[in-house]
Amino acid sequence: MCGIVGAIAQRDVAEILLEGLRRLEYRGYDSAGLAVVDAEGHMTRLRRLGKVQMLAQAAEEHPLHGGTGIAHTRWATHGEPSEANAHPHVSEHIVVVHNGIIENHEPLREALKARGYTFVSETDTEVIAHLVNWELKQGGTLREAVLRAIPQLRGAYGTVIMDSRHPDTLLAARSGSPLVIGLGMGENFIASDQLALLPVTRRFIFLEEGDIAEITRRSVNIFDKTGAEVKRQDIESNLQYDAGDKGIYRHYMQKEIYEQPNAIKNTLTGRISHGQVDLSELGPNADELLSKVEHIQILACGTSYNSGMVSRYWFESLAGIPCDVEIASEFRYRKSAVRRNSLMITLSQSGETADTLAGLRLSKELGYLGSLAICNVPGSSLVRESDLALMTNAGTEIGVASTKAFTTQLTVLLMLVAKLSRLKGLDASIEHDIVHGLQALPSRIEQMLSQDKRIEALAEDFSDKHHALFLGRGDQYPIALEGALKLKEISYIHAEAYAAGELKHGPLALIDADMPVIVVAPNNELLEKLKSNIEEVRARGGQLYVFADQDAGFVGSDNMHIIEMPHVEEVIAPIFYTVPLQLLAYHVALIKGTDVDQPRNLAKSVTVE
């Protein structure tokens, strides 16, 4: 959600900025822009509505020269998508890019208008530009002006500021929205995501909450909000950006669906030893903390919330630990009672999800036993701020609709369940069954992917549909939720998911020949109950699409399509049955002609409320 790239060097930086923006496209955006300043203080700004490629074409037509620059991809919050609202925003010689939301932008706007400033956009960002300009007019350096301006802003933001009169310096401020400095040789960089800077550096400083950074070609100085200098450690990143080529695939999402067997293998690598789960990466004190856990509270948003919902069944049935799962944006704004010895687990692909981070920070005040992050991005805010962390190791996920990040989150959660069951002294067969299932999972998914053509053919039935209903029971109910989310995200078909036992409590009224009903049906103890629910739909003329275990005993008919799945171990069934629902959503979206990798109005990483 929005992207920032900045650079200060002796060479022209426009192409560095553009490449950084290309690497941030996956986050979602509606417009893009950049501004560069040369050594004489001449500033050139380009902005375009639409894709980064349109901005790059404009830069070819109007070459940009200058060693200092900032660039941005915008996801509209205040003001419609337009070139006028695209960043960077300018106030005379002050140039600003900004991620986040300035909550008090309206009173600041009125105060600045009263001082004679004219606004040319609808954005909250332009307020920052004029405010810094005003403070600079009161005297002092750009850093001093920024230090006076920042306390006047309320909200979550990350901003980078440039003064065309002094092109030897960039100023940056972080409050709730991530910023990372990239360290070079005689040149330095800044971005909202380290992925943007991997072509130019592997050394990074992650700014912490409240940090204000002054960046020149040869130095980086960091201050707190009072102006006192603080030290931040620089780290060497081994993060790989492996998504530049879609290869044989049409979309990143398709590629990432097919990468799941290898992604899960990577998640398991080094974590299973002698038939047991080995999470020694958590550190020497982790076992002591985990052995005290009497309750688990999970916070997440979107797809990560659905993975938390699945794991609740596992934690309670396999490890005997009560577990609650809550949407992070709800948790942070209500008064909650903390259970004794409760472990806070946060789930996020990016590690920068604003509501999840806020929930984690709140949990530190509420007296939780400890915190554990499950994340795909090493060095992210969620990882740095948690007591313990487990990486999913899924590799870079570019498609906005999450696929391999979801299945690898579930893989890590299931390993954690095995670890806790052992620490609780439960029957060793629990861990044995989990390990056996996880080791078999990659090959099981490869088997399932061979059914792609069958699912593609079924997708034709959805081309004229406007609604769909997903059903599941037990730990397959959250998989139904995830299937509905995928379909609505990328095909724009309204989809809902219900626990199948809830059919008679409302959803049955929706059933007719135009309502496709998608069911996940592994061969487990709830199968007979699920078959009764399926018959309720069938009797009312509903069109059924049942993803069923090959041994489940279903017989197809005109209004019931059976997609047979290979039998899988019960413990891994939720992960396995996710994949055909991903493929269904993908093929329906293809038929409908939507933007699969960057669906409308959505962003990969939601870094604002």
From Swiss-Prot:
What's the chief localization of this chain? cytoplasm
Q: Which GO terms describe its molecular function?
A: carbohydrate derivative binding; glutamine-fructose-6-phosphate transaminase (isomerizing) activity
User: Which of UniProt's keywords are assigned here?
Assistant: Aminotransferase, Cytoplasm, Glutamine amidotransferase, Repeat, Transferase
Which biological process terms from the Gene Ontology are attached to this UniProt entry? carbohydrate metabolic process; fructose 6-phosphate metabolic process; protein N-linked glycosylation; UDP-N-acetylglucosamine metabolic process
Q: Where in the cell is it found?
A: Cytoplasm
Looking up PANTHER family in the UniProt record yields: GLUCOSAMINE--FRUCTOSE-6-PHOSPHATE AMINOTRANSFERASE, ISOMERIZING, GLUTAMINE--FRUCTOSE-6-PHOSPHATE TRANSAMINASE (ISOMERIZING)
Purpose of the protein: Catalyzes the first step in hexosamine metabolism, converting fructose-6P into glucosamine-6P using glutamine as a nitrogen source.
Q: What is this protein called?
A: Glutamine--fructose-6-phosphate aminotransferase [isomerizing]
From which source organism is this entry? Escherichia coli O6:H1 (strain CFT073 / ATCC 700928 / UPEC)
Taxonomy, top ranks, is: Bacteria, Pseudomonadati, Pseudomonadota, Gammaproteobacteria, Enterobacterales
- Name the gene that codes for it: glmS
